[in-house]
């Protein structure tokens, strides 16, 4: 459960992401593909090379979904319901991959905003991404 301080930290961090969301999302995906090569199996039709339009496009989708979630912290299940259905029933993504991408997102955000990435902000973002991951996997059961 996100505390009021966590919610404040998440909203502030996402405001700092601003117009860089698509680039950060793509960078996090690239980090994930390089660090955890098995995740590539979910994207057999993608050009996974650095800077590819497909990775950039999916990075934007990831960033947009997280921005939407950050704007609906009090009702994440409703905000992410369609995305949860998609990943559980159509794409059938192994839930562990959400944790891997979350880790790569944290690394990306820390790399771009080191001064703002305090231990408290890190903890809040980690809780936020873990909560998003839980919601996305809730329809697997």
Curated annotation (Swiss-Prot):
Query: Where Phosphothreonine occurs along the chain?
Result: 8, 108, 134, 137
Q: Which residues carry this modification: N6-succinyllysine?
A: 7, 11, 16, 40
The chain residues annotated with the modification Phosphoserine are 3, 35, 49, 102, 124, 138
Could you cite one Gene Ontology molecular function of this protein?
A: heme binding
Query: At which residues is N6-acetyllysine found?
Result: 16
Example GO biological process term?
Answer: hydrogen peroxide catabolic process
Keyword Acetylation recorded: yes
Report domain Globin positions: 1-141
InterPro entries listed in its UniProt record: Globin, Globin-like_sf, Globin/Proto, Hemoglobin_a-typ, Hemoglobin_oxygen_transport, Hemoglobin_pi
Q: Per UniProt, what is one Pfam family of this protein?
A: Globin
Q: Binding residues for heme b, per the UniProt record?
A: 87
List the GO terms this entry assigns under cellular component, sorted alphabetically.
blood microparticle; haptoglobin-hemoglobin complex; hemoglobin complex
Residues with the modification Phosphotyrosine, per the entry, are: 24
Q: Which UniProt keywords apply?
A: Acetylation, Heme, Iron, Metal-binding, Oxygen transport, Phosphoprotein, Transport
Annotated O2 binding sites: 58
Keyword Iron in the entry? The reply is: yes
The cross-references to PANTHER family, in alphabetical order and at most eight, read: HEMOGLOBIN FAMILY MEMBER, HEMOGLOBIN SUBUNIT ALPHA
Q: Which family does it belong to?
A: Belongs to the globin family.
Name of the molecule in the record:
Hemoglobin subunit alpha
């Amino acid at each position: 459960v996100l505390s009021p301080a966590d919610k404040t930290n998440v909203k502030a961090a996402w405001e700092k992401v601003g117009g860089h969301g698509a680039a950060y999302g793509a960078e996090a995906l690239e980090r994930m593909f390089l660090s955890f090569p098995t995740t590539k199996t979910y994207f057999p039709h993608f050009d996974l090379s650095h800077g590819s339009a497909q990775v950039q496009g999916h990075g934007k989708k990831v960033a947009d979904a997280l921005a939407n979630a950050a704007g609906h912290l009090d009702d994440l299940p409703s905000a992410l319901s369609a995305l949860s259905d998609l990943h559980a029933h159509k794409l059938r993504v192994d839930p562990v991959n959400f944790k891997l991408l979350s880790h790569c997102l944290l690394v990306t955000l820390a790399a771009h905003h080191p001064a703002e990435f305090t231990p408290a902000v890190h903890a809040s973002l980690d809780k936020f991404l873990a909560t998003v991951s839980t919601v996305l996997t809730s329809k697997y059961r």
